[in-house]
């Protein structure tokens, strides 16, 4: 029963695989493939198949359990399913022969039979023999599967005879076939079935295979199966066929041809491979690893099938290839990304076509590496190439690897970039050309559509080249520009017509009649018509403008952030805050004044004498003054000391003040120069603010040997210099005494120093002042128009650069306070800076003592706004007009600027206001001296202005004279004249430093109120207030006339008839008196009588006014009025420092407006105003104005007391522009007459040597020219260096040689050259203008001028030759007479100036301009010689001719035809060109007598 229940065991067969075996001699160097055949059948998976099996074993391996000392291997068993579904188990035995690895002979075994007999054995026995897997198993049996041969014995059921049909293995096929034949014979004896397996058919040799088939065909039932263990082809078929032969029930064996079986197997592999590759394609991250992926796929059937067929190694290789492809794809994308971003990088680093157009690729690479943005676009990797670094994984780093640029692709992109730039340049050029074409089409108006214009440009080349989108874009841009420009011009036109809008009160609404009037006036303007197609926009702009005019605020200002009010507030907020910080530091450094350090400056031993006198009056250097003891540290320095500047200021000695003592014109001139240098250097270096504020005191020494001879001259000169320098002047006390210095002088000077120091401490006190406005002596409003083309700091610099400037009352963000000496006292002046639109409310509602009206000479609208504002200002209020432009040259080169500046001066002349020009390129005008005369005028009229203001506001009596402001509690002492440091960084001429800065000189009309000092300077008459001809009140006391003294005959620089001239000048009264009695001539008067004595010497102790005059008996019955001004308003007189001489006259009429005083203003207003004024008609207004002003003009002569001197400091290159009143015809006639008389009295010309500008000793500068050159180097080294520097770096500098360079830089250049002749100017970082100034200074310092004095007359005569060619040849012959050294240098300099003039379109320096700048330097004129004044223009034209005709004079070239060849100037009537007694300069551009017809006495022309 049990047996029946047991399942039947599947049949089991043992197959023995046999074939050629033995030593290498028998079988060759490889086997016939028995082991591979067994391996592939038993373990068919690719990972379990081992292609290498060895038969050479060691004794140990041979004796191991796997081989077990047998010459056969047990491969295990495999269960196989037949086609009928019946299973069978097949045990596989391989019969082989193992070779000893020592002897290379077969191992000795228990069976000693040869292989042929052993292989044919049907019974095999080996106890505990293990299954063989691979060679590595031997010796390591425990690491592999251990499976024993069943029961240690097996019976062989069939044989599989292997025959190798491949080539090679160093054996002959015939020998193998012979061996096989013998083996087959033995196998046949066993009566077991045999099948031949043709192995290695994948490397089959057909001939061998045919022999095998032939061999088999000769045998009965011997089948041949073609196999390949490598590709697993027909392996299973061999064993299946053998089993079928053993078991007849399984059917007949089916042998498949090799090729068919191979194809079937390969198809199976390809299908599995495709499925596996698709499986691998699901992996997209090239960072994935095989281990991770295989673990995820190990259960997938496609994965398992491929692993079985191809193995893990191939699967890994397939995966690796896929990962590599992913990586390469990623790299490719990154490369494409980099290549695509290269154009953008090139555009960033190499945007300029001109720079790279001619560069090759390598040069472009080097250029890119130098760019600052290189690191933003490219990254230089430490390792290359870039695609093998981790940079490929930095997705967020978009920088391009620099080594990528070494590829051809990158170079191609660069070439494309260059071509793109070329094409883009062409496209832009065409767009711009098209734009210019549109600009040339005049009929294109703002707002015109493109369709109306397109038909006119269809044939244009540029239009055809660019695209339609480009053409529309260009036209749209053109339309925007012309519309914006038209709107700006329309707005500017509205400002130019400011008089049309500013006639209504603020916050008013314009009526329909007014609007109609506005449209009527404006409709005639082309700028109004230009916006015809944009009428709504035009109306909007007009209404916006009107709305702003009638409701002006800085928030709604049409200039936006460029509103003057906003800019002023911002500037003052920062500037005043910085001043406060500086004051705090200065205050803490200057509080101790128990010890006084005094610097005493003098000439010819005067300083030491004064120091000795002070020590005589001291006790152990302690000086008693006003009950206090001061320790004095005196440091006298003589003018001849070479280290005078270095001695002034040291770390150990910081002076509190400087006593400047003089007793002659020379010593006074030296003092003026020295103080100017100190202040200039202090302001430029700004190393110590205290040095800038150093107080100076001028002390006049007594002259024991010539008492009263030239004392008046020195007194006048000293007082004038003190006024200019804003410092005290200590006069010689009255009476006679034997010593040079009086104790009272020393005490007065010391008090002045102490008071100055005390005042400076008050000014710089860290406690904010912010005093109430009521404490201000004067309130000035400065007006400027919004949007003018200059910065507000330019017009405010005269105030902000002054140390006496401080903040105004808290809350007043647009005001500042000035402490300034006006008259004889220090005054507090409030300056309020406003826009014109903000000033209108101030003009109507607040008290203003004076207006400073600023306008741009480049802008008509600025002048229009000024006219509109000025027209409504009361004529009692003084006005200062200020025209602002870039440089002096603008007046000569720009007609529009010339017209506006002329109009400004013309208006100023008509209303008797002051006028000045301010240049942004000039430093000199940035000083408060610009407004000093204006402040004096305002202070003089203060009471009249306040009374008029009260009269208008309270409607009280016009005779009311009470001051609006409370009198200032401050009391000013006579010696409280403190200097303004920053204001005087450059003292007025003649004390300004050498340079090209424009200087303010009074016009001839202004000089009628002045006398000329010994230096050619004008100064007010001593002790006389600064009154003007144009005042309405003519009851002015005459000037005090000091008693004349007989001068010494040897006084330098005096005209022969000095005494008579002085007396005549002092005796003249330029004012019109109330009496009609004619004045006596000066020569008819007794020189010892008729001189008014100042009453301060008599009534000072009684508290009377300083300006009361006592009149002696007058033998000529001349009437001189005496006014006792303390009768009315004594307190106001004391406050102002002037007599109230105007209040009475002005109290008799109601003030008018300036538009009724100016024909220009009224004509403008009349053209606008259509309605009738309520008070009077236009004619009545003019008649009234004329009647009140009739007869107030009277010409006044200048007093030619002294000859001008040192005019090379007077700004020859830049003539001053300053005038403040009208000029009389008689004056010009008198001057012309005087010049003719002076020519008759001319004297022999003397050699003139100006003093050197240097303040240090030099062994080079100032030396004779012959000492500085050699035959090898005929040009001085310094001249060569300067010229080379200028021509290398500055030929195109605007204003070269005209614009002044920094004087400190000029001095440093010469000092450095003194120390080292090999200096490099470029390394000094100095400006071209500084080098140009140093070059001019070199020639100015030469002992003799470059053009010798001896040849001046010949040059003058040659220049008068009418014929141009003859004149040039005559000049050429004269030049040949130069000393050889002078000739070489002169040729070098003129050649250089010719090169400069060739760039005149850029640097604006024509030959004419250069000659103006250079001829005084080259010819060294003697301005003391009046005869010379009439020939200045001729000398200048000579130098201009040399520059223009440089090639002709020096290089035998042809005469150059110039557009403005200078003709010889007329020799007659020189007075029409140059005024006598005026420092040489170009004709003043803004003086009415030179640029416009002479004004009549009545400018309105009513009579």
From Swiss-Prot:
Subcellular location per UniProt equals: Cytoplasm; Cell membrane
Q: How does it sit in the membrane?
A: Peripheral membrane protein
Which residue range or ranges hold the pG1 pseudoGTPase domain? Answer: 590-763
Give the Pro residues compositional bias ranges.
Answer: 1036-1045
State which residue ranges cross the membrane: none
- Where in the body, by tissue, does this protein show up? Expressed in spinal cord, cerebellum, kidney, testis and lung.
GO terms, molecular function:
GTPase activator activity; SH2 domain binding
Residue ranges constituting the FF domain according to the UniProt record = 267-325, 366-420, 427-481, 482-548
Name the domain of life this protein comes from: Eukaryota
State the GO CC annotations: cytosol; endoplasmic reticulum; plasma membrane
- Coarsely, its chief localization is cytoplasm
Rho-GAP domain: from which residue to which, for each copy?
A: 1263-1450
| Entry comment, domain topic | The pG1 pseudoGTPase domain does not bind GTP.
Role summary: GTPase-activating protein for Rho family members.
Protein name from the UniProt record: Rho GTPase-activating protein 5
Origin organism is Mus musculus (Mouse)
**Taxonomic lineage of the native organism:** Eukaryota, Metazoa, Chordata, Craniata, Vertebrata
């Amino acid at each position: 029963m049990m047996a029946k229940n047991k399942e039947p065991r599947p049949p089991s067969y043992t197959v023995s695989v046999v074939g050629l075996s033995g030593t290498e001699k028998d079988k060759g160097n490889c086997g016939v493939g028995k082991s591979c055949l067994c391996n592939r059948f038993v373990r068919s998976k690719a990972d379990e198949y081992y292609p290498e099996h060895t038969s050479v074993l060691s004794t140990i391996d041979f004796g191991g359990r796997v081989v077990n000392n047998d010459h056969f291997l047990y491969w295990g068993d495999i269960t196989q399913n037949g086609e009928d579904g019946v299973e069978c188990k097949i045990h596989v035995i391989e019969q082989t022969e193992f070779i000893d690895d020592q002897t290379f002979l077969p191992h000795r075994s228990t069976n000693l039979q040869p292989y042929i007999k052993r292989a044919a054995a049907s019974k095999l026995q080996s106890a505990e023999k293990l299954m063989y897997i691979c060679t590595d198993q031997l010796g390591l049996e425990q690491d592999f599967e251990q499976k024993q041969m069943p029961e240690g014995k097996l019976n062989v059921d069939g044989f599989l005879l292997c025959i190798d049909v491949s080539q090679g293995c160093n054996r002959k096929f015939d020998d193998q076939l012979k061996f096989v034949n013998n083996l087959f014979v033995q196998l046949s004896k066993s009566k077991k079935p045999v099948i031949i397996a043709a192995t290695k058919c994948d490397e089959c040799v057909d001939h061998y295979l045919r022999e095998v088939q032939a061999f088999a065909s000769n045998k009965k039932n011997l089948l041949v199966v073609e196999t390949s263990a490598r590709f697993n082809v027909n392996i299973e078929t061999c064993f299946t066929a053998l089993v079928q032969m053993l078991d007849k029930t399984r059917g007949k064996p089916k042998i498949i041809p090799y090729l068919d079986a191979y194809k079937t197997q390969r198809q199976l592999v390809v299908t599995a491979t495709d499925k596996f590759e698709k499986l691998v394609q699901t992996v997209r991250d090239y960072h994935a690893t095989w281990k991770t992926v295989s673990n995820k796929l190990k259960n997938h059937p496609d994965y398992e099938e491929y692993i079985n067929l191809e193995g893990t190694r191939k699967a890994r290789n397939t995966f690796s290839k896929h990962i590599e492809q992913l990586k390469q794809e990623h790299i490719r994308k990154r490369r494409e990304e980099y290549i695509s971003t290269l154009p953008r990088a090139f555009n960033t680093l190499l945007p300029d076509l001109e720079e790279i157009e001619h560069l090759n690729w390598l040069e472009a690479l080097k250029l890119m590496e130098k760019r600052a943005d290189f690191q933003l676009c490219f990254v230089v990797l430490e390792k290359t190439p870039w695609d093998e670094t981790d940079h490929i994984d930095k997705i967020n780093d978009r920088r391009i690897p620099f080594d990528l640029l070494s590829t051809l692709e990158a170079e191609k992109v660069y070439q494309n970039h260059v071509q793109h730039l070329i094409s883009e340049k062409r496209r832009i050029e065409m767009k711009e050309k098209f734009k210019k074409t549109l600009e040339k089409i005049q009929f294109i108006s703002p707002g015109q559509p493109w369709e109306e214009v397109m038909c006119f440009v269809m044939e244009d080349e540029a239009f055809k080249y660019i695209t339609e989108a480009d053409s529309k874009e260009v036209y749209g841009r053109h339309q925007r520009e012309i519309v914006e420009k038209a709107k700006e011009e329309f707005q500017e036109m509205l400002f130019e017509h400011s008089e049309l809008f500013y006639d209504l009160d603020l916050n008013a609404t314009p009526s329909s009649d007014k609007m109609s009037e506005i449209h009527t006036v404006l409709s005639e303007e082309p700028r109004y018509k230009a916006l015809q197609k944009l009428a709504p926009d035009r109306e909007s702009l007009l209404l916006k403008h009107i709305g702003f005019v009638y409701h002006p605020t800085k928030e709604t200002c049409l200039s936006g952030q460029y509103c003057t009010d906003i800019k002023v507030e911002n500037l003052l907020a920062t500037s005043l805050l910085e001043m406060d910080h500086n004051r705090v530091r200065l205050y803490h450094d200057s509080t101790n004044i128990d010890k006084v350090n005094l610097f005493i400056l003098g000439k010819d031993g005067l300083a030491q004498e004064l120091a000795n006198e002070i020590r005589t009056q001291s006790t152990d250097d302690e000086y008693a003054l006003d009950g206090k003891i001061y320790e004095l540290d005196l440091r006298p320095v003589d003018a001849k000391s070479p280290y005078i500047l270095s001695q002034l200021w040291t770390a150990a000695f910081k002076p509190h003040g400087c006593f400047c003592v003089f007793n002659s014109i020379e010593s006074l001139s030296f003092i003026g120069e020295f103080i100017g240098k100190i202040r200039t250097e202090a302001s430029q270096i700004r190393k110590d603010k205290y040095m800038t504020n150093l107080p100076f005191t001028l002390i006049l020494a007594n002259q024991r040997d010539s008492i009263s001879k030239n004392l008046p001259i020195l007194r006048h000169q000293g007082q004038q210099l003190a006024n200019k320098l804003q410092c005290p002047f200590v006069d010689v006390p009255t009476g006679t005494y034997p010593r040079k210095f009086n104790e009272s002088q020393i005490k007065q000077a010391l008090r002045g120093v102490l008071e100055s120091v005390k005042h400076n401490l008050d000014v710089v006190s860290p406690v904010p002042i912010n005093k109430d406005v009521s404490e201000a002596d004067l309130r000035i409003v400065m007006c400027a128009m919004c949007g003018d083309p200059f910065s507000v700091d330019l017009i405010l610099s005269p105030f902000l650069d002054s140390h006496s400037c401080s903040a105004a009352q808290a809350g007043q963000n647009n005001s500042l306070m000035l402490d300034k000496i006006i008259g004889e006292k220090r005054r507090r002046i409030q300056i309020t800076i406003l826009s014109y639109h903000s000033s209108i409310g101030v003009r109507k509602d607040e008290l203003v003592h004076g207006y400073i009206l600023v306008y741009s000479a480049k802008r008509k609208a600025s002048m229009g706004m000024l006219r509109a504002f000025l027209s409504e200002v009361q004529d009692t209020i003084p006005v200062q007009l200020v025209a602002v432009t870039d440089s002096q040259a603008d007046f000569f080169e720009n007609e529009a600027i010339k017209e506006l500046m002329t109009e400004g001066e013309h208006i100023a002349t008509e209303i008797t206001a002051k006028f000045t020009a301010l240049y942004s390129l000039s430093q000199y005008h940035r000083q408060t001296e610009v407004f000093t005369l204006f402040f004096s005028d305002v202070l003089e009229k203060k009471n009249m202005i306040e009374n008029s203001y009260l009269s208008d506001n309270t409607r009280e009596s016009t005779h009311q004279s009470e001051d609006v402001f409370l009198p200032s509690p401050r009391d000013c002492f006579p010696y409280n004249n403190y200097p303004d440091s920053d204001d005087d960084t450059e003292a007025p001429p003649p004390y300004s430093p050498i340079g090209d800065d424009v200087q303010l000189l009074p016009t001839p009309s202004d000089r009628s109120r002045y006398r000329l000092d010994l230096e050619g300077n004008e100064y007010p008459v001593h002790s006389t207030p600064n009154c003007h001809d144009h005042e309405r009140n003519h009851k002015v006391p005459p000037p005090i006339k000091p008693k004349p003294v007989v001068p010494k005959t040897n006084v330098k620089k005096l005209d022969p008839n000095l005494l008579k001239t002085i007396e005549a000048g002092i005796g003249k009264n330029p004012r019109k008196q109330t009496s009609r009695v004619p004045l006596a001539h000066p020569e008819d008067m007794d020189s010892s009588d008729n001189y008014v004595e100042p009453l301060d010497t008599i009534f000072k102790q009684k508290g009377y006014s300083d300006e009361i005059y006592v009149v002696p008996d007058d033998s000529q019955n001349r009437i001189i009025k005496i006014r006792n001004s303390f009768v009315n308003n004594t307190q106001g007189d004391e406050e102002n420092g002037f007599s109230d001489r105007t209040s009475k006259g002005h109290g008799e009429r109601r003030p008018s407006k300036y538009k009724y005083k100016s024909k220009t203003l009224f004509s403008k207003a009349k053209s606008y105003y259509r309605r009738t004024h309520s008070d009077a008609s236009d004619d009545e207004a003019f008649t009234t104005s004329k009647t009140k002003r009739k007869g107030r003009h009277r010409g006044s002569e200048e007093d030619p007391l002294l000859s001008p001197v040192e005019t090379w400091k007077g700004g020859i290159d830049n003539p001053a522009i300053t005038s403040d009143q009208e000029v009389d015809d008689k004056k010009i006639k008198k001057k012309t007459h005087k010049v003719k008389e002076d020519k008759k009295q001319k004297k022999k010309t003397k050699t003139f040597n100006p003093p050197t500008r240097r303040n240090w000793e030099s062994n080079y500068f100032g030396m004779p020219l012959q000492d500085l050159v050699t035959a090898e180097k005929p040009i001085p080294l310094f001249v060569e260096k300067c010229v080379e520097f200028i021509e290398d770096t500055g030929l195109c500098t605007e204003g070269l040689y005209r614009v002044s360079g920094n004087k400190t830089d000029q001095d440093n250049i010469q000092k450095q050259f003194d120390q080292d002749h090999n200096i490099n100017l470029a390394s000094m970082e100095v400006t071209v203008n500084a080098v140009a100034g140093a070059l001019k200074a070199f020639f100015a310092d030469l002992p003799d001028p470059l053009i010798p004095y001896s040849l001046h007359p010949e040059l003058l005569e040659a220049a008068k030759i009418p014929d141009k060619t003859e004149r040039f040849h005559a000049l050429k012959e004269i030049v040949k007479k130069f000393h050889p050294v002078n000739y070489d240098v002169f040729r070098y300099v003129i050649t250089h100036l010719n090169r400069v003039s060739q760039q005149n379109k850029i640097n604006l320096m024509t030959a004419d301009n250069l000659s103006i700048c250079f001829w005084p330097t080259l010819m060294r004129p003697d301005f003391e010689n009046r005869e010379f004044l009439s020939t200045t223009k001729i000398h200048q034209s000579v130098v201009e001719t040399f520059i223009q005709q440089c090639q002709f004079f020096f290089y035998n070239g042809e005469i150059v035809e110039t557009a403005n060849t200078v003709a010889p100037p007329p020799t007659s009537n020189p007075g029409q060109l140059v005024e006598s007694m005026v420092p040489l300069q170009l004709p003043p551009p803004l003086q009415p007598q030179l640029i416009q017809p002479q004004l009549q006495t009545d400018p309105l022309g009513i009579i």
